[in-house]
Amino acid sequence: NVIEQSIRKSISTELDSNSKKIGISLSSGIDSTLVLALLRKEFPSTDIESVSVKFSESIDETDISKKISEKFDTNHHILEIDNFLEELPKAISIVKQPFWDLHWYYLVKKMKNLTNVFLSGDGGDELFGGYTFRYKKFLELTNENSNTKEKIISYLNCHERDWVPDQELIFGNEYKFNWEEIYQILEPYFNNSLSNLTQVFLADYNGKLLHNMQPLYSSI
């Protein structure tokens, strides 16, 4: 399996075979579970510290992550966060950008007391096409006759859960938001001969993966 071999090679290349402990961010999803499974194959006798984050008033899947941790014999930790906004200023001061996803902050804070090396499954959706609900909506909003701008607008409309509805109130009048600039950034990914769905994969990879996750994990 090419994907399995590639991930295992990446794990073995990045990690020291003499590592006494390795950490992993473990959700209940396929991506982090796959990384953990292959990590255990590469390091069958190494102590693995797995960490899951549980935010109050959001869907709790930590019971599933606990079962996964038991299957792959990890030392599992569950972080329960009641007020996730409490340390927002500290989190933003680290990455210098207003990221809304704060699970990484609490993961790193916990991991630094466990090990200096940790892995996650972040980026799997962008690499392997995990946002099926978005793809379905995009294909419903577009067709083979849709022009570049129409496809870009449809693509953005598939990300409504990521929008900040009151951004002017939050960022103030000095924040000059311009839709045309957004369209220009995305234009290369939708103005080409690829199929509509492949264009979405291209935009996902060059957008969130390269300009969100990569800078984030480089900062921490």
Question: Which residues make up each language-model segment?
Answer:
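ATP-dependent adenylate-handling active sites, centered on carboxylate activation for C-N bond formation
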Residues: 1-200, 216-220
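Short Ser/Thr-interspersed hydrophobic loop/turn segments at strand-loop and sheet-helix junctions
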Residues: 205-219
